[in-house]
Amino acid sequence: SQSVGQITAGIASELDQQNYLILLGNTELDEQRELGYLTAMQRNHVAGIILLGCYYSPQLARAFKACRVPLVVTGQRFPEVPCVYNDDRSAARELAQRMLACGHRRLAYIGGTEKDQAVGLARRQGVQDALNAAGLDGDKLPRLCCSAFTMEEGERCMNELLACCPDLDGVVCVTDTVALGAMRALRAAGRAIGTQVSLAGI
């Protein structure tokens, strides 16, 4: 995603200033590959390890805690492991609260896999928190899960939501890219964005 590219560029720039070389490994969110890279990098005596975008699991948490070199996880919370992450739940809650403050009451959510506790689970919970605080039933939030954070998936999910919830008046999307796809579907359906339907990505 664009954000991962920006984070990687920032890390590379800082390491370059400190005269470190960066070694990249792409695991495609495969836990066994993540564990394999972790072992290989320790054997090769790297100065430190930064992990971007892994899913939480007890096995990974144990491996991270046992790591013999400095290690930081970004984008996900692992107990007793140094982590840098966003407050995804609060971000989603505040976004939904803004929609509710504009008078929208029939919100829907386009999210990601809830194996990802930060982006997938916490963001959905944030939207539900806002609905519950407004006296609505967050458990009844219409939601769909994207298989990837792409415009195509956003468009597909939005079309499905329009078919099952034609009276929705607000949509929170897991990312801006997904929201762009949802916008395309709303326009094709003749829905006026900003008046008939509010739309936003986190």
PLM-predicted stretches and their roles:
Residues 22-26:
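Short beta-strand->loop structural element characteristic of the AMP-binding/adenylate-forming
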Residues 3-6, 33, 59-60, 126, ...:
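Phosphate- and divalent-cation-binding pockets in alpha/beta enzyme and binding domains
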Residues 1-13:
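N-terminal winged-helix
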Residues 4, 30-31, 53, 88-89, ...:
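A conditional alpha-helix N-cap/helix-loop micro-motif detector
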Residues 56-67:
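Active-site-adjacent beta->alpha loops and helix N-cap segments on the catalytic face
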Residues 28-31, 52-57, 177:
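Short beta->alpha connector loops
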Residues 10-21, 36-45, 65-73, 77-202:
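Bacterial carbohydrate/catabolite-sensing allosteric modules
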Residues 49:
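Intrinsically disordered, low-complexity polar regions and short flexible loop motifs
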